[in-house]
């Protein structure tokens, strides 16, 4: 049997990290088994579903590299299929029309609560045939009254639920639209889904869906209900814990490789291994190795992984993501050194790609002002002579590379009888606008001699103005 999994988000918001982890687990299982991964958009909640949310989900999946083999399918385009099956179930006595109003049902539920009973529909219209003409109705599934439902779960083991605990589920609303629980069942059947990986909040739906599948004569898939993700305070992950949208992590400068590696470890493990390439995930992943307990989201751990991937991935893999961040900050990387070279020299110095773009602008455009703290400390009148001397030494170079630049700076310090810092730090502030950069010879080598000359002149003007004020 070929494994077929699915990710089936509701388009009522962005793709959050919990949904992304579910999608990843589904995708990994399909790939590990040589199977198929289906993307389905469960948009039956017409009032809350938006095209903007659909676009955000698709964008998030594509950015993560979780490509789908089939789909995306949309439930709203399959209403005719659902209704045809509901009519068949009506004819076969597996479903029935219920004319109970919402007010009547609310009244019954309040009485049940007052009596300490579980609120539920009492089956009033289950066997009635005295249907009032012209009155609104819903269609309910005739859930079995006796016996048990067995849910075979890869994560939680076998779960048994007595049918007496389940009421008759609405499968068609009074406005003629099918409900979520029915659409899911039909879709899983039609799409040949063999393994359903989803959040633990769906456990209560599962026995109902199994009963509908069996009533339709459809095969029952295997299930894996994943525990929720908590914040570091032990509460359900929410916006107060930081970013929860996948694309917010992109905007904040995280690599998809880092986020995937982090998400796969939120519940699944393979020995003590922390770093997993996508290929390793596919090779090693199994549903049975997912833990039952909830996982806590730790942003510091994600940042550590992101730093690792920025440093360790081939520059060619980091390049397109880095370039996007430079573009977001209005930096044209065609106006300077090859971005690959900038990534190489900055990779050890940054936690995110957003930070990379923020601290590397001076390679591609003129900085407006000096960093105030750095200029105050290093662009003092005493720095005028070293700057003038090192400018002359650098401009006299016939060959411009890191080695000759390093030698010129060293010789300038020796000639002036001062330490390297007395030359190097003012030069660094002049060249970059700040007191932080990769090694000075490497930094200057990525810039042009004429840029260095202009920036040293800018620093000398700053010093002169400082003397006059």
From Swiss-Prot:
Motif window: 'KMSKS' region: 236-240
Keyword Secreted set for record: no
Signal peptide location: none
CDD domains from the UniProt entry: GluRS_core
Placement of sequence motif 'HIGH' region: 9-19
Subcellular location: Cytoplasm
GO MF entry, a single one: ATP binding
EC code(s) of this entry: 6.1.1.17
Residues that coordinate or bind ATP: 239
PROSITE patterns given in the database record: AA_TRNA_LIGASE_I
Role: Catalyzes the attachment of glutamate to tRNA(Glu) in a two-step reaction: glutamate is first activated by ATP to form Glu-AMP and then transferred to the acceptor end of tRNA(Glu).
Protein name as it appears in the record: Glutamate--tRNA ligase
Organism: Pseudoalteromonas atlantica (strain T6c / ATCC BAA-1087)
